[in-house]
Design a protein with these regions (language model features):
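Core catalytic region of metal-dependent phosphoesterases/phosphodiesterases
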Residues: 1-61, 138, 164, 168-173
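Short hydrophobic patches on amphipathic alpha-helices
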Residues: 4, 99-101, 136
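Structural motif
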Residues: 13-14, 108-110, 145
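Active-site environment of divalent metal-dependent phosphoester hydrolases
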Residues: 1, 18-24, 40-46, 74-78, ...
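Conserved catalytic scaffold of divalent metal-dependent phosphoesterases
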Residues: 37-127
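Proline-aspartate-enriched helix->loop->beta-strand connector
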Residues: 32, 106, 132-146
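Binuclear metal-dependent phosphoesterase catalytic core
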Residues: 59-63, 84, 135-138, 151-182
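Structural motif corresponding to alpha-helix initiation and N-cap regions
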Residues: 20, 129-130
Length: 182
């Protein structure tokens, strides 16, 4: 039933805070690549068997140039997958440089947290990253997918254009056409 319902899926994306067992199940059912980043609740050694972590990396998967940055704003003195905006700016700059050296604009940017002011929350835990606003303005990926902020009952905006990038909160899940993301 899962294979038939999602027969056109070419790539699975995990935006953090999803159990590895769940992602592994989806990979085995659909038999397509999985690109993922860790969330702020994931363990330091979070790994998904059959998946590819794109945290701080970029790669081509099924013809799609994918890059990712996991984690959230730092809200504890010591916390796994938590960063200050300055730390994330450094990570984003390295990722942008790596993708440029690879000679390809990023098609799909995956993150856990959203950009600052887009789908984020008013509290420190759910604040977005200004570094992502800069990354989107400079790198101009076609699409950014993020999680972290849990939208209840469709009361909040989950799709926003920022610069040239369509930004989508994928909570709880989304099927997206890369050619016509909505």
């Amino acid at each position: 039933a899962v294979r038939e319902r999602f027969a056109d899926v070419r790539l699975i994306v995990g935006c953090g805070d999803l159990p590895s067992e769940y992602l592994e199940y989806v990979v085995t059912q659909l038999n397509v690549p999985l690109a993922y980043v860790p969330g702020n609740h994931d363990a330091d050694d979070f790994v998904v068997q059959g998946g590819l972590s794109v945290d701080g990396r970029w790669m081509k998967l099924n013809g799609i140039a994918v890059a990712g940055l996991g984690g959230s704003q730092r809200y504890k003195p010591v916390g796994k997958h938590q960063y200050t905006d300055q730390e994330m700016l450094g990570r984003a700059a390295r990722l942008l440089l790596t993708s440029r050296i690879g000679g390809r604009r990023v098609d799909l940017f995956i993150s856990h947290a959203p950009p600052l002011g887009v789908h984020d929350g008013p509290d420190a835990v759910h604040a977005g990253f200004q570094a992502f606003n800069t990354f989107l303005r400079t790198g101009q990926p076609r699409l950014m997918l993020h999680g972290h902020t849990h939208v209840q009952r469709n009361l909040a905006t989950t799709v926003t254009r920022l610069h040239r990038t369509q930004v989508i909160n994928v909570f709880p899940y989304r099927v997206i056409d890369l050619e016509d993301p909505r």
